[in-house]
């Protein structure tokens, strides 16, 4: 069996192009692109996915080995596609951060912070808890496979070398951010209702009993009742989030 070594440069260039798209996406993917995960692990995951995707979509790449400029432009195009896909998946986590921020404010815990492992910075405690719980459920339910499936489908929508429509990208970003904020508010809706009713009740109590220190009674009572509500609705909240994530992944690629 003879191997035509003249094909190796083109194959190597195709490998690097596929790796550019997948690597950019992995660096932003929920669960894989966290700041506390070593870069070598991220690169290993991207390399493994590249070895899987390359045989499936090698024919989609038409590499011109005579022009380094066109090769670099094509690689930049692949990186941008990977960033768009990864950032869209990453935005889904912001829904939990929005919900956590609203819940913390309604329970009087807006001052309680901790390190957010997904962002590498300080964040509200409840928001961090919901984010970690959401990531755990994504892996426990194999929903992260949908991100990989979206990556595979992206070759049908964003063909290598084809000029990306800025309108499609803008529409994708707008829908992603709007949906994340909407879901975040829906997840925190029970606590918004609780906060409204509770604060009205405290206001009435303060007018009826002016000598009573309402603040010292209201804060611990708000936290206690709020956590009771949190325990009752957490299952429904995370179920809603998982359905939202699955819907985003299914709608990620069919833009046109």
Protein language model regions, located:
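Hydrophobic alpha-helical segments and their helix-loop boundaries in membrane
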Residues: 1-256
